[in-house]
């Protein structure tokens, strides 16, 4: 009985901790966000893994992102996603088609231009610990959505303690899937024209255009 009471007490403490807006976590998140905003534009190579222990899923691929303000271009093995802040293009080379849609800034889909400030709205945050990851000391912070029906129930961010850049982040969904993005190469303050963030049909003659707007 005493054991059950003790376990219940620990659960209570854990839930209470996650209900807080941890000032230590906020200080790190604010510093990280300010750093990326000051860059203007950046480019990053990354690895992506999808794991699910129950379904025995373990997938990995590499990609590249270019971000400038609200605009981004995401190059993946089987698709390229381009967003100019208003319109979203998804180019599928194997299908020889491009889907065009209006950009929804409130979508729960992974958005490279928003991950650095996602904590500012509808999330609670908690500093967990300092941990050495890949030889780099990182501050580990959990973001927990305030909405119970959110697509992801937790996002864990590993932020480099020395310079407040993002080392990696993992998104946990209710189906047991874990989506991990790890930055493998980072180039800040790059020069890139706004036209880079718009799909150019001249580069893909004969492609089928599917306009979903």
What function would you assign to each model-found segment?
Residues 4-13:
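Sec-dependent N-terminal signal peptides
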Residues 16-57, 70-71, 203, 208-213:
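N-terminal leader/targeting segments and the immediate start of mature chains
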Residues 19, 126-205, 210-213:
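Gly/Pro-enriched, hydrophobic low-complexity segments
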Residues 39-41, 60-62, 69, 83, ...:
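Extracytoplasmic
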Residues 48-50, 79, 92, 170-173:
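Beta-turn initiation residues at beta-strand->coil junctions
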Residues 62-110, 179-180:
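An acidic-aromatic
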Residues 103-137:
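Flexible, surface-exposed loop/linker segments and immediately adjacent secondary-structure boundaries
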């Amino acid at each position: 009985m005493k054991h059950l009471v003790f376990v219940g007490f620990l659960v209570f403490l854990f839930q209470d901790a996650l209900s807080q807006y941890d000032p230590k976590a906020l200080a790190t998140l604010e510093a990280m966000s300010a750093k990326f905003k000051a860059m203007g534009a950046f480019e990053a190579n990354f690895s992506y893994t999808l794991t699910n222990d129950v379904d025995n899923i373990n997938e990995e691929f590499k990609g590249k992102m270019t971000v400038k303000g609200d605009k981004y271009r995401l190059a993946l093995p089987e698709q390229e996603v381009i967003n100019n802040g208003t319109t979203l293009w998804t180019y599928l080379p194997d299908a020889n088609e491009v889907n065009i849609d209006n950009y929804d800034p409130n979508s729960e889909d992974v958005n490279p231009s928003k991950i650095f400030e996602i904590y500012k709205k509808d999330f609670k945050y908690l500093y967990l610990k300092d941990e050495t990851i890949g030889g780099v000391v990182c501050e580990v912070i959990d973001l927990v959505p305030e909405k119970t029906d959110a697509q992801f129930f937790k996002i864990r961010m590993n932020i480099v303690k020395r310079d407040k850049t993002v080392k990696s982040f993992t998104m946990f969904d209710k189906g047991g899937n874990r989506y991990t993005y790890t930055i493998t190469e980072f180039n800040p303050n790059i020069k890139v024209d706004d036209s880079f963030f718009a799909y150019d049909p001249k580069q893909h003659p004969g492609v089928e255009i599917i306009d979903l707007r």
